[in-house]
From Swiss-Prot:
Belongs to the eukaryotic/archaeal RNase P protein component 2 family. InterPro entries: Pop5/Rpp14/Rnp2-like (IPR002759), Rnp2-like_sf (IPR038085), Rnp2_archaea (IPR016434). Keywords: Cytoplasm, Endonuclease, Hydrolase, Nuclease, tRNA processing. GO terms for cellular component: cytoplasm; ribonuclease P complex. Its main location: cytoplasm. It comes from Methanothermobacter thermautotrophicus (strain ATCC 29096 / DSM 1053 / JCM 10044 / NBRC 100330 / Delta H) (Methanobacterium thermoautotrophicum). It is found in: Cytoplasm. The gene is rnp2. This is Ribonuclease P protein component 2.
Amino acid sequence: MKILPPTLRVPRRYIAFEVISERELSREELVSLIWDSCLKLHGECETSNFRLWLMKLWRFDFPDAVRVRGILQCQRGYERRVMMALTCAHHHSGVRVAIHILGLSGTIRSATQKFIKPSKKDKY
């Protein structure tokens, strides 16, 4: 089976986000939270077009809450709809959560450099 040439591949975008929760969420719970929020807001037919995939996660422990940053892949043209659905999520399995969108990027590398792990000279 041949690999599709770049001209025929579906264009993708990467959404950098941060999840703040009362307790630590596993990767499976986070995937479930993302899919549930998209399904509740847009329905099954629309959500199937998003082509969502959770690429990477970084965990940061703070005294007051657990923060997880991640990169979510979606199809180009649906970024705004995915971001709307993510910000609407506030509860999952009895745990309060808040999702903040950090930014949008065309590559995983630039999303990581800009939003997830900023360099030391970029500190305020």
